[in-house]
Amino acid sequence: MEVTDVRLRRVNTDGRMKAIASITIDHEFVVHDIRVIDGNNGMFVAMPSKRTPDGEFRDIAHPISSTTREKIQAAVLTEYDRVGQEEESTIEAGA
């Protein structure tokens, strides 16, 4: 399994959520609404989830193995960093 595409949109909020991403797996399957979160131990990726009637959040889709989770997280965070550097370059060029 390979993450073949990452689409990312940074969000400017005061909260811990920093971006929302969509990934394509093996050019065949897309997962939307993956969140990039600034956690207590650094940035991490939260899979799409929905709130249950009792108020808990349950993942809609998630990797089964830690290896797959690491691949997804690495791909999304790499794109997050790339987009951030691109935005900084644009701001510096316009200043």
From Swiss-Prot:
State the Gene Ontology BP annotations: division septum assembly; sporulation resulting in formation of a cellular spore
Pfam families in the cross-refs:
SpoVG (PF04026)
Protein name in the entry: Putative septation protein SpoVG
Family, as annotated: Belongs to the SpoVG family.
Keywords tagged on the record = Cell cycle, Cell division, Septation
> Does the record carry Amino-acid biosynthesis as a key word?
no
User: Which cysteine pairs make disulfide bonds?
Assistant: none
Task: State which gene encodes it.
Answer: spoVG
Functionally, this protein is described as follows: Could be involved in septation.
Q: Gene3D superfamilies recorded for this chain?
A: Stage V sporulation protein G
Name the HAMAP family on file.
SpoVG
The keyword Cell cycle belongs to this UniProt entry's keyword annotation:
yes
Q: InterPro entries of this UniProt entry?
A: SpoVG, SpoVG_sf
The record ties this protein, via PANTHER family, to: SEPTATION PROTEIN SPOVG-RELATED
